[in-house]
Amino acid sequence: MKVTLFVTCLVDMFETNVGKATVEVLERLGCEIEFPEAQVCCGQPAYNSGHVEAAKEAMKHMIETFEDAEYIVTPSGSCATMFHEYPHVFKDDPKWAKRAQKVADKTYEFTQFIVDVLNVTDVGASLPGIATIHKSCHMTRMLGVTEAPGILLSNVKGLTVRELPNVQNCCGFGGTFSVKMTPISEQMVDEKVDSAMETGADYLIGADCGCLLNIGGRIERLGKEIKVMHIAEVLNSRS
């Protein structure tokens, strides 16, 4: 099975280890990974900031880059969601809307692909300790992926998963929201950190690097002792 990887901007620039873990997990599951070097940003930051035409140019480039893929997989629920929004963005342009739909139909978030397409619930990972899961807004509310991360983590040897209080609450990242509305964002992430600490977990695990960079940065500034990990890193663990 050929999988074309959309690595995302944040993974490419800040969390390359997440990209490596994503590839290694998928390869162990029998996937052949392709990486188009022409890939750029999915256009979400520009689109959400109101720069629609600039966003469309990036989106068109991404459609051209990925439309011939068999499966498109990304370690980000937020970026996967943006791919699924492409048909809506181009709804008044039938030519591009059709091409956008073709891309959207074969785009999956990393854990969604493992559980729903590969039909795998245990990847053979092991990580001793206690974890709690942060569920990102776009991934759960828009993409509809709510169960796959928990299913996979429940089968990680040695790992106990505890429910995160107020798990439905946003972490305060929201892309440019955290920059434009910093005081509100800080209050939101403080509440998220407090909830994570309440669980007594060793690890806070999520599927979006934006959320994890935001939460992890706040944890570090506050001097809290809980390790933030992307789920790809956890599933690639052999502790």
From Swiss-Prot:
InterPro entries xref list = Cys_rich_dom, LutA
A single GO BP term for this record reads: lactate metabolic process
**What are the record's GO terms for cellular component?**
cytosol
Which superkingdom is the protein from? Bacteria
- Listed GO MF terms: oxidoreductase activity
Outline what the protein does.
Is involved in L-lactate degradation and allows cells to grow with lactate as the sole carbon source.
Tell me the protein family, please.
Answer: Belongs to the LutA/YkgE family.
- The molecule here is called Lactate utilization protein A 1
List the source organism. Answer: Bacillus cereus (strain AH820)
Its organism's taxonomic lineage begins at:
Bacteria, Bacillati, Bacillota, Bacilli, Bacillales
Gene (name only): lutA1
